[in-house]
Regions:
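Substrate-binding cleft/loops of secretory-pathway carbohydrate-active enzymes
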Residues: 291, 295-319, 362-367, 395-403
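Bacterial Sec-dependent N-terminal signal peptides
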Residues: 1-18
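Catalytic domains of carbohydrate-active enzymes that cleave complex glycans
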Residues: 409-590
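Structured mid-domain segments that build the active-site/substrate or prosthetic-cofactor binding neighborhood
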Residues: 221-222, 333-432, 438
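Aromatic, loop-rich ligand-recognition surfaces of beta-strand-rich domains
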Residues: 598-662, 677-723
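Feature activates predominantly on carbohydrate-active enzymes
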Residues: 26, 36, 41-44, 48, ...
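Acidic, His- and aromatic-enriched active-site or binding-groove loops in soluble protein domains
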Residues: 263-281, 309-328, 408-415
């Protein structure tokens, strides 16, 4: 979608090349070499000159160069790969390339800085119409700060946007799309697990083959199998020379056999085994490049072994908080120690940075103030490649703005972040921009004032007394009301504003379900509005596990709005036989019978046990008739939260002698979606009882297919309902 804008014109300098005069083309585009990149660059220039002025510049390959021609694709050594030179002098405009997509990126820079074109999101750009297009004398050379730049954004599906933001895709670089968590693709546990369990991690006293287990990297047999597999991959992908040989997803699942432990202790980090193994591959294939993760248990570098130059370290800051730059909180400083440690032994670092709330992607995540400082930090510490994993799907918190700012800052970390934000907002939100800018400033200030961390598994409920308190939400809504009024006559801008408001609407719904009383009719109306807007604009999901909006709205009505069910155990006293983990005990006495159901984030309302059974008794205060008992469980595989083996319900009159009412068995469930699982036992005939005992049998250890293979599984429950 095109938005015609009246933007501040670039400073006027003496014209050297006239491309268009009074809507008529005065120049032509000459390809120095006729290849795909140069031709795409030429077509991009041709398109936007035409849309700006009406003049159509012809494109010729290897044609005669004359006055007013635009030469695209000559080589230059004034920049590094992907870089470019724009030289306008002596009546000719030359856009030179330092390699790869340099010609395209040079054209983009020219269009932005001289013609006032801004490509802001998928199929959406702004430009300043002018019947005359003249390029002043200039000589500009630019190189990217990072040789690889990638971020998540639904806008990346638009190839013009992706080129405009100067972004790459990992599949362009990594052979066979082997770019992260590749162990099980290279040495499949489904093939080798049963016959060779010794290839896999030794955890808690035995070998644990599985698709999330790691390799026993001191086993001499593995290397040749993997090397042969890698050789075949490179032969099948002759145009690519990089591959990732990296741990499967999951924490602390590294091998702890005596030989691996000996290396880990000597190196001071499990990363020692990994770097040693990668170095052997790098020596076997000296003309290839090998990437491996420094992630979770391998984040900190080894003390002695150093990666060879063709070993790339993909360092991930997944465990850090996001409310301040990495230098300013303890989790960030721990990562910084790792980054500085790797920087001392390698100049080949790929940083994987996170700016996402995995559990609630449609929730406010005000991290814009830290983007520039963190990217500068990565650059100072030898990072040459950068991936920004952010909330990138449509409807997530200011996804378009975040992707725009990151694209610009990954190319040049010295740009002014606030200016980038305001430029984007003027183009993307039009007359609503001042209100949304004010909203972001207020939200960020409130976050910092609250002292509450911003986490990648966050919940709006965490911030309901801070940046999302009732008074602030009222002020935010007033700003959005004004923003919607300002663009009411522009359907495109109104859509942008309404989508930007979704995180605030979602937060209000999430907070409302944790509060007793209140206007439930108003909450239901808000839920209807949220669902309608999401459906209207095609918002696909609410979290990393792809839970759909329509399912959220349906479950919200079932769980959090009045449904006529009366819990006879409401407010019951809880007597613990096997209490939950200590961190959940402060809420446990009330959370199981307070009538407030937990949401999709385990950090609020849920009560958890890890690796052991649960056993507790509810004292209902008097004899009551019991017909049915239901307990609500959470299923969230990514957090090691699995369904237990079973739950059994017992009844008693005296809290001493209990009789079994029934048992609910849980089937294995590998579904990655976050969901709520009710465990119900319905009695064939009612019984009288004062006490209800609940006994949950743990699954024990996470199974071989799970991220936490070999470690104790969690289960979480919240509400026990007696009918």
């Amino acid at each position: 979608m095109l938005l015609v804008a009246c933007l501040a014109a670039p400073s006027v300098l003496p014209a050297q090349v006239c491309l268009v005069s009074k809507g008529k083309a005065q120049a032509r585009i000459v390809l120095a070499q006729d290849n795909d990149v140069n031709r795409k660059a030429a077509q991009l220039l041709q398109r936007f000159v035409r849309e700006t002025s009406g003049g159509e510049l012809p494109i010729v390959a290897n044609g005669r160069r004359s006055k007013n021609c635009v030469v695209i694709g000559e080589s230059t050594d004034e920049a590094t790969d992907d870089g470019y030179v724009i030289d306008c002098s002596r009546g000719t405009l030359a856009i030179k390339t330092a390699g790869d997509k340099g010609a395209i990126y040079g054209v983009v820079a020219l269009l932005e800085k001289q013609l006032g074109v801004d490509y802001l999101a998928k199929d959406f750009y702004t430009l300043t119409p002018s019947a005359d297009v003249r390029i002043p004398q200039m000589h500009v050379a630019e190189s990217p700060a990072f040789r690889f730049r990638q971020t998540f954004s639904y806008s990346n599906n638009d190839s013009t946007y992706r080129d405009w933001m100067r972004l790459q895709e990992h599949r362009e670089m990594f052979a066979a799309d082997m770019w992260v968590h590749t162990f099980d693709r290279l040495l499949p546990s489904s093939v080798y697990g049963k016959s060779h369990p010794e290839y896999y991690s030794f955890i808690n006293g035995e070998r644990r083959p599985g698709n999330h287990s790691q390799w026993c990297l001191t086993n001499p047999d593995i290397f040749e199998i993997v090397a042969h597999r890698i050789d075949s991959i490179f032969k099948a992908n002759p145009d690519q020379n990089m591959i990732s040989v990296s741990q499967n997803d999951g924490n602390d699942t590294y091998c702890q056999c005596p030989e691996c432990r000996k290396v880990n202790e000597y190196e001071g980090s499990p990363a020692g085994c990994y770097v040693r193994f990668l170095n052997r591959l790098a020596e076997r294939f000296p003309d290839k490049h090998f990437s491996t993760l420094a992630y979770l248990f391998t984040m900190h570098p080894p003390k002695h072994v150093k990666p060879l130059p063709n070993v790339n370290i993909m360092l991930c800051d997944i465990d850090t908080k996001r409310e301040v730059p990495l230098t300013d909180n303890e989790s960030g400083r721990d990562f910084l120690r790792a980054l500085e440690g790797w920087a001392k032994i390698s100049n080949n670092i790929f940083v994987w940075d996170y700016g996402i709330n995995f559990d609630n992607v449609v929730a406010p995540f005000p991290n814009f103030h830290i983007l520039k400082k963190n990217i500068q930090l990565f650059k100072r510490n030898h990072a040459t490649m950068l991936f920004e994993q952010v909330n990138g799907t449509l409807g997530t918190d200011f996804a378009e703005l975040r992707a725009y700012m990151l694209g610009k800052l990954m190319w040049n970390p010295e740009l002014d972040a606030d200016s980038l934000m305001q430029r984007f907002m003027r183009g993307y939100y039009g007359a609503a921009a001042p209100y949304l800018y004010r909203y972001q400033q207020m939200l960020t200030g409130a976050l910092l004032a609250s002292g509450t961390p911003l986490w990648i598994y966050d919940s709006p409920i965490t911030h309901k007394n801070g940046m999302l308190n009732a008074n602030l939400r009222k002020a935010y809504n007033e700003l959005f009301d004004e923003a919607e009024k300002a663009v009411a006559a522009d359907s495109a801008m109104l859509a942008h504003v309404r989508i930007a408001r979704l995180p605030l609407r979602y937060s209000e719904l999430e907070i409302a379900r944790t509060e007793s009383g209140g206007d439930k009719a108003a909450v239901e109306k808000s839920l209807d509005t949220f669902g309608t807007i999401c459906a209207l604009y095609g918002v696909p999901t609410l979290n990393e596990r792809n839970n759909k909006v329509e399912d959220y709205c349906r479950l919200y009505r079932q769980r959090f709005l009045p449904n006529g069910t009366k819990n006879k155990a409401a407010g019951a006293k809880v007597i613990w036989n096997i209490p939950p983990q200590e961190r959940y005990q402060p809420i446990a006495d009330k959370a199981l019978t307070d009538g407030l159901y937990g949401g999709t984030t385990f950090v609020e309302s849920w009560v958890g046990w890890q690796g052991e059974d649960a056993d507790f008794v509810l004292d209902m205060g008097e004899q009551k008739q019991v017909n049915k008992i239901t307990t609500d469980f959470l299923h969230q595989l990514g957090q090691w939260i699995l369904q237990p083996k079973s739950v059994a319900y017992y009844a008693s009159d005296d809290a001493k002698n209990f009789r079994l009412l029934g048992t609910h068995e849980f089937p294995e469930d590998r579904d990655i979606s976050v969901k709520f699982v009710p465990a119900t036992v319905t009695l064939s005939a009612p019984v009288q009882a004062r006490y209800i005992r609940v006994v949950v049998k743990t699954l024990g250890l996470c199974p071989s297919w799970h991220y936490g293979v070999g470690y104790p599984a969690w289960f979480f429950l919240d509400e026990v309902v007696v009918e």
